[in-house]
Amino acid sequence: MKSAINNFIFLFCACMIFIACGTKKGNIVFDSNNGGLFLPDGFGAVVVVDSIGPSRHIAVKENGDIYVKLKITSDAPGSVALRDEDGDGKADIIQPFGKYVNDGIFATGMRIHNGYLYYSTEKVVYRQKIDNDLVPISKQEIVLMDESDQWHIAKPIAFDKEGNMYVPYSAPSNACASFINTTGTSVQQAGQYPCPELVNHAGIWKFKANAINQTQKDGVQMGTGLRSIVAMNFNASNNTLYAVQHGRDDLHLLWPNHYSAWQNAVTPAEEFFEIKEGNHYGWPYTYYDPITRQKMQAPEYSGDGKTIANDQSIVNPLIAFPAHWAPNDLLFYQGDQFPARYKNGAFIAFHGSTNRGPYPQAGYIVAFVPFKNGKPSGTWEVFADGFAGVDTIVNVSDAQFRPMGLAEGPDGSLYISDSRKGKI
């Protein structure tokens, strides 16, 4: 997840007028090239802000103010607030704020809930009461403290209608391997069974949104068997939690006798799940093959790339996206500005792959999935493309921009943050 500076692409229907900051109105003039993006007919894009620093998730207040969680590698403010004062869709005020302990490169969460701004560093979920001021001035409260220190430590945040907050504790490993067995040039791992990481990791926990100073033991585990979750949200139409998983890596590197380099590039799928308490979604024992459309036994657990998983209790995905695309945010569209088919549908920001070599990298898009009655009602499609700025991405460093976070504005506009350069 490399990033250098940050972008906000502001998307909205071409026939609409944008209304921001309460009573202030202004006609939006779309960028002539839609900010470098390729969009469906009838949509336009405006660049909102430039060079605010590498960003993660974003949130938009009811008056149009924008809040961004930054990826911090130095002693600098960890968030930034933006305000459009003349209704042209571009930020006129850019105000960094907040210094937090243990911020770090995987600081991620930024959401607004019941009058509070919630945001997360790598190990802490904070909140502050927000009012008419652009930058929160209220006391900062610790909602949740993570006492562990591990890989996959990002903490996205989601809320339901009953006063609960959801935070993932992702897996600290690739496949829950217990030891390494080296034979010649082949390095193979044996998986632990049962996997001890499933006790306190590889799942999503439910907490009270209004409680302070919680730790993991105050929460209730929802789903398990989820390797790494950054894209997670509630669908308000059915009050159900959904998540898109980062699948495992290194099938060819660790198991070259079972998987070719090409199989490694296209397997396993990034899986889109409906999250239910008590469900097991497969990691580390299985993975989903997007070619065969089946759950397969993981090689660390006696799989060979051909053995179908026989545990019927493991839940299949609603949709299987291409391998290694790195789903980093999920938004269910609630507005009325976009055409009716987008209502309650899912937008997913794919950050883009890093490990498909020797084949080109892929992803770097925002996808859309139509929904009806809480289930996908059609195939997924590319909504926004062109972030990478090049036709062939040999290495992740070739990509000019990488879509990262999603937020919906009060008028139904869609905001997209980029984790590299800060174009708007």
Predicted regions and their residues:
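Beta-propeller domain segments
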Residues: 25-39, 171-217, 224-397, 401, ...
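Beta-strand-rich domains and repeat architectures in extracellular enzymes and scaffolds
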Residues: 46-71, 326-332, 347-349
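Surface loop/turn motifs at the tips and blade-to-blade linkers of beta-strand repeat domains
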Residues: 48-52, 96-103, 142-149, 220-225, ...
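Beta-rich catalytic cores
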Residues: 54, 75, 93, 103-106, ...
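Hydrophobic core register within WD40 beta-propeller blades
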Residues: 58, 110, 157, 229-232, ...
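Short loop/turn segments immediately following the C-termini of beta-strands
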Residues: 63, 71-73, 122-124, 130, ...
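Conserved beta-propeller blade signature
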Residues: 65-69, 116-119, 164-168, 240-244, ...
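Asp-box/WD-like beta-propeller blade repeats and closely related beta-sheet repeat scaffolds
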Residues: 93-97, 102-113, 122-160, 168, ...
